[in-house]
Amino acid sequence: MGKKINPILFRLKKNTVYHSLWYTFKKNFCYYLKCDILIREIIRRNFLFINLSYIDIIISNKLTINLYINNVDQFNIIENYLDVFVFQISKILKKNVILNFVFNHVLNAKNIAYNVVNQILNKNSIKKIIKEELLKNRKNFGCKIQISGRLEGVDIARKEWSLIGRIPLHTIKYNLEYYQCETLTQYGILGIKIWLFKKNNEK
């Protein structure tokens, strides 16, 4: 069971915080869900060059968006675009928008995937990429990186993965992060999956 289901979904009720914090009646649920998806899509489209750790969306009388970033320098890059972004969101949803930035220095699975994608686009060796990222995360209890597809232009698609520490997929009480994404190369699409076993008090 633990190997088939998404690890975040498996632990959602126990020790994982959901990043869409809003409640509504059944008749309005579809509208709020569309708003949530639309906001995340606009954020990804506008801040494509920024490595966002998490996006928290809180909808009530006002719309509150918390963006978690790892580097203060990233905030300086997007500072000039914030007014346009807030205006765009408030115009679509017709709500007052509060935008908060939270500087989160704890590395998570999405940050690792972001680094892996950048190194793949720079045409580094797949085995070298995985080895370097695992060494960076050796302070965690466990980390697993898997890259699949036509690696380095080979004719037959394959998987390359490596693990440091342990990844307890079946134990719900442990703080386990998971992230998957895709990147387009000249040989086709590569799939990237990250499992990260962190300390329970880390976000």
Curated annotation (Swiss-Prot):
Residues 39-113 form the KH type-2 domain. One of its GO terms (molecular function) is structural constituent of ribosome. SUPFAM superfamilies: Prokaryotic type KH domain (KH-domain type II) (SSF54814), Ribosomal protein S3 C-terminal domain (SSF54821). GO terms for biological process: translation. Keywords: Ribonucleoprotein, Ribosomal protein, RNA-binding, rRNA-binding. It comes from the Bacteria. GO terms for cellular component: cytosolic small ribosomal subunit. Belongs to the universal ribosomal protein uS3 family. Binds the lower part of the 30S subunit head. Binds mRNA in the 70S ribosome, positioning it for translation. NCBIfam families: rpsC_bact. HAMAP family: Ribosomal_uS3_B. Part of the 30S ribosomal subunit. Forms a tight complex with proteins S10 and S14. This is Small ribosomal subunit protein uS3. It comes from Carsonella ruddii.
